[in-house]
Each structure stands twice: as structure tokens, then as C-alpha cells.
Regions:
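N-terminal helix-cap/turn-to-beta initiation motif at the start of protein domains
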Residues: 29-51, 66
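C-terminal motif of bacterial Sec signal peptides marking the signal peptidase cleavage site
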Residues: 15-18
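Structural signal for glycine-centered tight turns and loop->strand junctions in beta-sheet-rich domains
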Residues: 69-73, 154
Length: 181
């Protein structure tokens, strides 16, 4: 009986210690403040439709993203690749083939000051993208914390995941577009 009574007292003490305030305590006040500032500055500019296209000899890539004010996201990706081969001593390209990551998708987005790696010293402005393909594939279209650079009335710039420019960034342009290929 004494053990049972002692256990009840310990459990009640733990419950009272965990619930001593109705106000939640922020774990990282600096990250919270920077996240709020990031959203005040850029979230309204993010809302809308953006597109990015990159065409090279061996690949063609198009992506369109629509960011909604409620934190939802819809998008489309078209990606094709081909190989350079030598036939009878002549270099040629194979036919274009669709990459499996092509398709339409939907999900969520948010801006946050954080460290995707979980280390305080690597915190930065991030664009968090979580999206599944509309045809219910086993893999996701996005599950990524991209380093966010900026958004303006005309340009949205963040670190590329699948395809990127020479500097490691992708610069989406505002507006609706269709792939040129």
C-alpha cells in the first residue's frame, strides 16, 4: 500500500510540475522572432503562381508552384532527360524521356527560421515544402527545407533541390506559364 501511495504522489507531482502555467513557453525565442519577421516580410509576396524553366542539352525542366495564403501549395513539374551516345562514330542524342518526378502535386508550405540539420549554428531562413503527387505515388514530390533567399513582386529565389542554376539557386518568375517543350 505504501508503494502505491508513493507512486500516486510522484505522478501527481509530475502532473503539477508539467502544468504549472497555461502559457506555453517558447523553446527558442530567437527562432520564433526571426520566423515571425520572415513571414511578415515575405509571406504576402509568396502568395500566387510562380514558374521556373531550365533547358540544357541533356535535360529540360519546368516547374510551376502556386502558394495559397492558407499555407497550401499546388504544383506541376515536367522533367525530361536524354543521353548522348555514339553510333557508328557519330555522337547523337537519344529521344527525350520523362523523369519519374514529373506530374502534378499538392501539399503545404511555410517560411521558418530553422536548422533542418538540427544544429543551432546552421539556422537560416527556410522554405518548407511538403507535397504529394496527385496520383498517390509511393514517394513525395517535396519533403524539403530549402534555404530561402527572397521573394519580390517578380522573383522567388530559393536553393534548388532537383535542378538548380550554376550558383545553386532557382529563381522562379511570377505568373502562369506552360512548358516550352
Amino acid at each position: 500500500m505504501n508503494k502505491f501511495f508513493y507512486l500516486i504522489i510522484v505522478l501527481m507531482t509530475i502532473m503539477l510540475a508539467c502544468c504549472n502555467s497555461s502559457d506555453p513557453e517558447l523553446v527558442d525565442r530567437e527562432a520564433q522572432e526571426k520566423t515571425e519577421a520572415l513571414n511578415r516580410q515575405y509571406a504576402p509576396l509568396m502568395v500566387g503562381t510562380w514558374y521556373y524553366e531550365k533547358i540544357e542539352d541533356k535535360q529540360r525542366y519546368f516547374e510551376q508552384l502556386t502558394f495559397h495564403s492558407d499555407g497550401t501549395l499546388t504544383g506541376e513539374r515536367k522533367w525530361q532527360k536524354r543521353e548522348q551516345v555514339t553510333i557508328d562514330g557519330i555522337q547523337r542524342y537519344t529521344d527525350w524521356e520523362n523523369v519519374d518526378l514529373s506530374g502534378t502535386f499538392s501539399g503545404t508550405w511555410s517560411l521558418k527560421y530553422c536548422s533542418p540539420e538540427g544544429r543551432t549554428e546552421t539556422r537560416r531562413n527556410c522554405l518548407l515544402l511538403e507535397a504529394r503527387y496527385d496520383d498517390e505515388r509511393a514517394y513525395m514530390a517535396y519533403s524539403h527545407a530549402a534555404t530561402f533567399d527572397y521573394a519580390s513582386e517578380t522573383t522567388l529565389r530559393f536553393q534548388g533541390l532537383y535542378v538548380k542554376d550554376e550558383d545553386g539557386w532557382v529563381s522562379f518568375q511570377r505568373g502562369n506559364a506552360e512548358p516550352s517543350f
